[in-house]
From Swiss-Prot:
Gene name in the database record: ispE
Protein name, per record: 4-diphosphocytidyl-2-C-methyl-D-erythritol kinase
Binding site for ATP: P93, V94, A95, A96, G97, L98, G99, G100, G101, S102, S103
Family recorded in the similarity comment: Belongs to the GHMP kinase family. IspE subfamily.
Active site (record annotation): K9, D135
Species in which this protein is naturally found: Syntrophotalea carbinolica (strain DSM 2380 / NBRC 103641 / GraBd1) (Pelobacter carbinolicus)
GO BP field: isopentenyl diphosphate biosynthetic process, methylerythritol 4-phosphate pathway; terpenoid biosynthetic process
Protein EC: 2.7.1.148
């Protein structure tokens, strides 16, 4: 058995530029991985079945699980038939705007590539990943990224300052499909550019924007309340990540971030995490 860490992500900004003919939306986003991890353990077993175990949580299992589909996709590409046990130690909240499922799938692709000695490049793995989900290539890319298209066209963003984030999840599961179905598109913006950084926290705060937030907040006003609580505990700015329901605050230092996370973790049903960027 070999184990791998699958990090969460946040969207520092998320702009919806329009609806495509294929039903997806054209996006422009700044995405960053953060130090909240699922642990994925992989071990080969007799036969050809791919089994998924995730103790303590209700997740799709078997081929309904994105991690299992990732394993099958890699086996198919390599022309391999193997049995596999996938054990997921789930720490990233589910359906929370943090990309946990996509990260798990990306980690399975990369882990099996190493374990089997396939030698597939990151680009080749990303080609498989995008078939599983739009966010999967980002976790294979392993850099802060300006993501366009459906989120699958990635350009590295350099110079992001060493800020801290506090992630707050109130235990609400939000359907990404529902959010996009209820999104009212505004006029397109054609002046968006890859952000440049000189290393200050204010540069991150100035970018905070999420077109999906108005939809989710209308149904779940608690998200707006969490933003205000983060600001009251020292956050320089706060935003919903992805389609929600997780909210993150931007902090200048670890001590203030950890104190805020401890405070917010005491609320019934809430989970809060002080995290740092993952840039390698």
């Amino acid at each position: 058995m070999e184990s791998f860490l699958a990090p969460a992500k946040i969207n520092i900004c998320l702009h919806v530029l329009g609806r495509r003919e294929d039903g997806y939306h054209e996006l422009a986003m700044l995405m960053q991985r953060v130090s909240l991890y699922d642990r994925i353990s992989l071990s080969f077993i007799e036969g050809n079945d791919i089994r998924v175990q995730c103790d303590g949580l209700t997740l799709p299992l078997g081929q309904k699980n994105i991690a299992a589909r990732a394993a099958q996709a890699l086996f198919d590409r390599a022309g391999i038939r193997r049995g596999l046990d996938i054990v997921i130690e789930k720490n990233i909240p589910v359906a929370a705007g943090l990309g946990g499922g996509s990260s798990d799938a990306a980690t399975v692709l990369m882990g099996l590539n190493d374990m089997l000695g396939l030698g597939l490049s990151a680009t080749q793995l990303m080609q498989e990943g995008v078939k599983l989900g739009a966010d999967v290539p980002f976790f294979i890319y392993k850099h802060p990224a300006w993501a366009t298209g459906i989120g699958d066209k990635l350009q590295e963003v350099e110079g992001l300052p060493p800020v801290w984030y506090v992630l707050v999840n109130p235990g609400l599961e939000v359907s990404t499909a529902w959010v996009y179905q209820n999104l009212r598109l505004t006029s397109a913006r054609d002046n968006l550019r890859i952000p440049r950084f000189s290393g200050t926290v204010d540069e991150v705060v100035e970018l905070l924007h999420n077109d999906l937030e108005t939809v989710t907040v209308e149904r779940f006003p608690l998200i707006g309340e969490i933003k205000q609580q983060l600001l009251g505990l020292g956050a320089r700015g706060a935003l919903m990540s992805g389609s929600g329901s997780t909210v993150f605050g931007v902090f200048s230092d670890g001590d203030t971030a950890r104190a805020a996370a401890e405070n917010l973790s005491s609320r019934s049903g809430w989970r809060a995490f002080a995290v740092e960027p993952v840039n390698d």
